C-alpha cells in the first residue's frame, strides 16, 4: 500500500471524494486522545444469518432493550434480501410500513432505531450508479424517520472489480470513499446522522493477529470520517474475552474507540445449541475504551431474554455473571406460564436455572452442569471402575438425579402457553434428555460389574438413537478435542 494520502490516486471525477475527506495522522488524537464525547451506544443488533425475527418479535425486542436499560436496536438480519443480496432495491409499501412502525415504537421508548445496509457482495465502489443506489436507499429510510445507519462490509473476499482496481489504491480506500460519500450525503439531508461502519477485518483474527500491522485497518482509521463509528468483535469472531489492552490497540489504529459487535450469544454458526446464559469474559474496565456495545444474539428470539438483560447489566457496570443472571431470571419467569393452569402457574426459578445451565455460553457449560459432567468423566475414567466404592455410587446417583431433573424440565416445557418459547428450546432439551438417558443406562450397566471384554448391550438398554448424516461423517474425519482443536487418525 502507498504511503501518500488515501485519495491521492483517485480519478478527479469521483463525486464526493476530495482531499478534504481524508484525514492525516496528526488531525486525530492518539489513543489517550481518542474521541470520548459520544454517549455509549448500547443494545441489540439483529445481525445473524438464518431466519430473521418477525415484526412482532422486533416490537417486543424494543421492550426488552428498554427494560434492560439500553438505547439502540439495529435492524440488520443478514438474510433480509434487501440488506445484502439485493441491497440496491428499496422497500415496498408493506415493508416500509413495518419499518415506520418500528421507528415510531423505538421513539416512543426513547430508543435509537438503526437500519443496516450491506452493499458488499457485488458493489463497484467507483461506479456512480452504485453510489446513487445507496443514496436512494438512505433517502427512503430518512423519509421513514430513520437517522441511524450501519454500512456493513463484513464476510466478503478482499477483492474488487477491475474498475475499482484502477480507481483506488486499496480495497480499504474504496470502502472509505464509498462510506464517506454516503455520510456526506446524509449530512446534507438531516442534522446529526449516525453512521456505523463494519470493516472486512472486523476482528484481530482477520488482521492475522497483527492489528497494528494491518494496512487495511490503518487505511480505515486514517481515511474514515472521524464521526463514523467502527464495529469490532474483539480477538475473534466470537471472542472468549475482550481485554482492555486489545481495545487500546484497535483504538489507536482506528483513531477512535470501537463499537463492539458482541457475538458472544450468537448461534448462527452452530445449529446444535443456543446460548441462554449471561454475558461473560468481559470486565467493566473496558467500558471506557469503547463507543458502544450491541449484542448479536441467538436466532431463536425467545432464547435471548437473559442474554439481552445481562448485556444491559454489563454496560451499566455489572460484570459478575452470577449477579447479572440472578437478576434476570425472575424478570424472565413470567414468560414461562403453564397453559390451562388457571392460577397463572409458572416454572420455578430452579427450573429456569437448569434450563440456562444446559444452554449456557459458547465456551463453557453452566457451573452446576459442568461439575456433574466432571463427575461423570471420573466415573468413566477406568474401563472397569470399582463400582462398590462410595464415591462411585454417589456420583452415579448424582447423574441419575440430573437425568430426572432434565426429564422433568422437558415435560414441563411441553406445557408452556408460550409455544414460541417452547419451540426455541425444544430440540436442545430433547437432545439433552436423550443423551443423559444414554449416559445413565451405561453407568447402570457398569454398576452391575460386567466382566472385562463384555460389550455394552446397547440394543437392549437404549432406543436406537444414533446420529448420522453428512455433517457427522465429516466431523468423524476430523474429530476435535475439548478445546476445539482438530486432529486426525487413520
Enumerate the language-model features and the residues they cover:
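Short, positively charged and aromatic/hydrophobic N-terminal segments
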Residues: 9, 14-22, 27-31
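Feature activates predominantly on carbohydrate-active enzymes
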Residues: 23-137, 143-147, 187
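Catalytic-core regions of glycoside hydrolase
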Residues: 45-48, 147, 159-319
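Conserved residues at the C-terminal ends of beta-strands
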Residues: 47, 76, 152-154, 296
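Conserved, mostly hydrophobic/aromatic
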Residues: 65, 151, 293
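Short connector loops/turns at beta-strand edges and beta->alpha or beta->beta junctions
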Residues: 78-81, 154-158
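C-terminal functional modules
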Residues: 320-490
Amino acid at each position: 500500500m502507498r504511503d501518500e494520502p488515501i485519495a491521492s490516486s483517485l480519478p478527479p471525477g469521483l463525486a464526493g471524494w476530495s482531499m478534504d475527506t481524508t484525514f492525516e495522522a496528526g488531525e486525530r488524537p492518539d489513543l489517550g486522545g481518542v474521541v470520548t464525547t459520544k454517549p455509549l451506544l448500547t443494545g441489540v443488533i439483529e445481525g445473524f444469518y438464518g431466519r430473521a425475527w418477525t415484526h412482532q418479535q422486533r416490537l417486543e425486542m424494543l421492550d426488552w432493550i428498554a427494560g434492560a436499560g439500553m438505547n439502540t436496536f439495529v435492524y440488520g438480519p443478514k438474510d433480509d434480501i434487501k440488506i445484502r443480496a439485493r441491497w440496491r432495491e428499496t422497500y415496498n409499501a408493506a415493508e416500509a410500513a413495518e419499518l415506520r412502525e418500528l421507528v415510531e415504537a423505538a421513539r416512543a421508548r426513547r430508543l435509537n432505531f438503526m437500519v443496516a445496509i450491506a452493499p458488499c457482495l457485488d458493489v463497484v465502489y467507483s461506479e456512480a450508479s452504485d453510489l446513487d443506489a445507496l443514496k436512494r436507499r438512505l433517502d427512503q429510510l430518512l423519509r421513514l424517520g430513520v437517522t441511524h445507519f450501519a454500512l456493513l462490509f463484513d464476510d466478503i473476499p478482499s477483492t474488487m472489480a477491475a474498475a475499482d482496481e484502477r480507481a483506488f489504491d486499496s480495497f480499504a480506500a474504496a470502502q472509505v470513499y464509498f462510506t464517506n460519500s454516503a455520510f456526506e450525503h446524509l449530512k446534507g439531508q438531516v442534522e446529526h446522522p449516525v453512521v456505523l461502519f463494519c470493516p472486512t477485518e472486523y476482528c484481530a483474527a482477520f488482521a492475522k493477529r497483527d492489528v497494528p500491522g494491518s494496512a487495511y485497518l490503518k487505511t480505515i482509521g486514517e481515511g474514515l470520517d472521524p464521526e463514523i463509528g467502527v464495529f469490532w468483535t474483539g480477538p475473534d469472531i466470537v471472542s472468549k474475552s475482550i481485554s482492555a489492552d486489545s481495545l487500546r490497540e484497535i483504538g489507536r489504529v482506528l483513531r477512535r474507540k470501537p463499537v463492539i459487535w458482541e457475538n458472544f450469544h450468537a448461534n448462527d454458526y452452530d445449529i446444535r445449541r443456543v446460548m441462554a446464559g449471561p454475558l461473560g469474559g468481559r470486565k467493566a474496565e473496558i467500558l471506557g475504551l469503547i463507543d458502544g456495545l450491541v449484542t448479536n444474539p441467538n436466532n431463536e428470539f425467545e432464547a435471548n431474554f437473559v442474554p439481552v438483560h445481562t448485556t444491559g447489566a454489563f454496560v451499566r457496570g455489572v460484570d459478575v455473571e452470577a449477579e447479572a443472571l440472578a437478576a434476570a431470571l425472575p424478570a424472565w419467569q413470567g414468560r414461562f406460564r403453564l397453559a390451562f393452569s388457571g392460577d397463572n402457574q409458572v416454572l420455578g426459578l430452579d427450573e429456569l436455572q437448569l434450563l440456562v445451565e444446559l444452554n449456557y455460553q459458547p465456551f463453557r457449560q453452566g457451573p452446576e452442569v459442568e461439575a456433574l459432567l466432571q463427575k461423570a468423566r471420573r466415573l468413566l475414567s477406568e474401563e472397569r471402575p470399582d463400582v462398590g466404592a462410595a464415591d462411585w455410587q454417589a456420583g452415579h446417583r448424582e447423574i441419575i438425579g440430573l437425568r430426572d431433573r432434565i426429564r422433568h424440565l422437558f415435560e414441563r416445557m411441553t406445557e408452556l402457553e408460550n409455544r414460541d418459547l417452547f419451540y426455541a428450546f425444544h430440540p436442545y432439551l430433547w437432545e439433552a434428555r436423550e443423551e443423559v438417558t444414554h449416559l445413565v443406562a451405561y453407568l447402570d450397566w457398569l454398576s452391575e460389574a460386567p466382566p472385562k471384554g463384555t460389550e455394552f448391550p446397547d440394543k437392549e438398554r437404549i432406543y436406537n438413537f444414533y446420529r448420522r448424516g453428512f455433517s457427522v461423517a465429516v466431523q468423524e474425519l476430523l474429530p476435535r478435542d475439548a478445546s476445539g482443536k482438530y486432529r486426525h487418525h487413520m
